[in-house]
From Swiss-Prot:
Source organism of this protein record: Paracoccus denitrificans (strain Pd 1222)
Cofactor note: Binds 1 [4Fe-4S] cluster. The cluster is coordinated with 3 cysteines and an exchangeable S-adenosyl-L-methionine.
SMART domains: BATS, Elp3
Record: residues binding [2Fe-2S] cluster: C93, C124, C184, R256
Protein encoded by which gene: bioB2
Name of the protein described by the UniProt record: Biotin synthase 2
Amino acid sequence: MPQQSRSAAEIYHQPLMDLLFQAQTVHRAHFDPNVVQCSKLLSIKTGGCPEDCAYCSQSARNGSELSASKLMEVQRVLAEARRAKEAGATRYCMGAAWRSPKERDMPAVLAMIRGVKAMGMETCMTLGMLDADQALRLKDAGLDYYNHNIDTSERYYSEIITTRTFQDRIETLERVQAAGINVCAGGIVGMGETAEDRISMLETLAGLEVPPQSVPINMLMPMAGTPLADVPRLDAIEMVRTIATARILMPASYVRLSAGRSEMSDEMQAMCFFAGANSIFVGDTLLTAGNPDEDKDALLFAKLGLRAEVPEASQEGCAA
């Protein structure tokens, strides 16, 4: 059956060997299958977020014991960025636990973008919802990518978040694209959603006016004190199916194997790479979640014959 005539559900639910073969075929048509993009993520403002995202330890409404911090000083952010570049990162992603940026913080945020850009790395930020003017100012400062995940399907969304709507997220993505910034948008799996919710989420992303340049697929890492702290872990094959379907639906996008890698075996990660994932975050922390240390990633890359994308060949990137 020709790919374009099949529904996303037919792609997702087909026999796994067929799904993996098709995903790897699509992947090889657009990317070197042995190259993985490596990005670094820094939390520039942690905790105290007014949103009620059920998965997030940074929400002030959840019962986690995470303390709120102030916005990190610009020079400290740039020092961390230099270390990331020296360690091989080709793009630098900065995240703040906000509903949306406040005007008083914009000068510092813009200075961070300009400073990281001057180092020769690509820049990405995730700051919450944006209005049109904020998006244009970020673009003018040199922002390459903006991350704003849709998290899950429109149907399941209100089970996870009530303080902003699914449409709010779509409108922010539209403003980012209108400003000329590349979009990074994905979601989280393993939050109690159905396979149909995962499929619907991917259909929404692929159906944007321009599909995201980067699609982070996060596997829920249950955080103590959050409403999802005791959600059963998603079956590994469902994660692989999600990655493979994302690759087929968005063939030219980077598909990032994002949060949750610290809980995955080498074999599971290898299957995700074979399914079309070609981007990861490096470093031992993703905002507030754990991540494999860089030595462990180096060993895995050596075992699988993978190599990190070099800056000269780099094209896309973003946050979790």
